[in-house]
Amino acid sequence: MPQKPGVVATMADTRHVHVFDASAVLQVGFRPSPHSSLPQALMTKGPRTTPSKPLFTFKGHREEGFAIDWSSRKPGRLATGDCAGNIHVWDMKGSSWQVDSSPYRGHQGSVEDLQWSPVEETVFASSSADKTVRIWDTRGRNGPQISLNAHSTDVNVITWNHGVTYLLASGSDDGSFKVWDLRAIREASPVAHFTHHKQAITSIEWAPNDDSSLCVSSADDQVTIWDLSVEAEEGPPGDYPPQLLFIHQGQHNVKEVHWHPQIPGLITTTAEDGFNVFKPAINVST
């Protein structure tokens, strides 16, 4: 939860969604050791905390799912999506949560990703294996406000720009990613479309300190950084698009990329063989 980082939500193949308070675990993990520069938790063998019960468990999803996102605008508000195409919205009530009695329906395939609007607490976006991106408003239950045929294959991931809040980016199973202007989304034409990656896009995120920078990971074992403020060059296209600033390699099966919210340019990637933390020698912020 952005407003309380120790509170986390998990979703597994049991179809259940759990909310945990991991504050104690985080405090242990960052307690300094007097004999090492590493956190004490990394130097100590064996269990360091007792297992804790979840604060809340929701068992209403019909199938397992992957999509989950906390709202940055309304504390405790959570959206979860499953492989049956259903989306549930949660709201915190006191020390517990209240989940909507009926899900948001509209997708004809698995809900792959969810993103709350950075400015509207009732608006969220979803992407699906049905090749669409949809925009929803919790104030209405008559289906999505906007349905966009975004890609020719599954739309795996989406990211909402927190600086230029009408920009949404989507990444697909075919390795392409697109940027959409929500002010003109009914035209169904992206403002940018890139096909550098040759396998499925697995993660995508706008930089929090630079409205024009994106980080993208793919099943082709590349993590790329893009600056969309760079204009296309005249003449025949080269081997690499001019907007492509940096390629990070060396990891296998990269699943997620995240920018550090306070340190400009610092990126964390998680993969099958571990995680990397790095800062490219490029200027991605001013």
Predicted regions and their residues:
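Loop/turn segments within WD40 beta-propeller blades
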Residues: 1-5, 69-75, 115-121, 140, ...
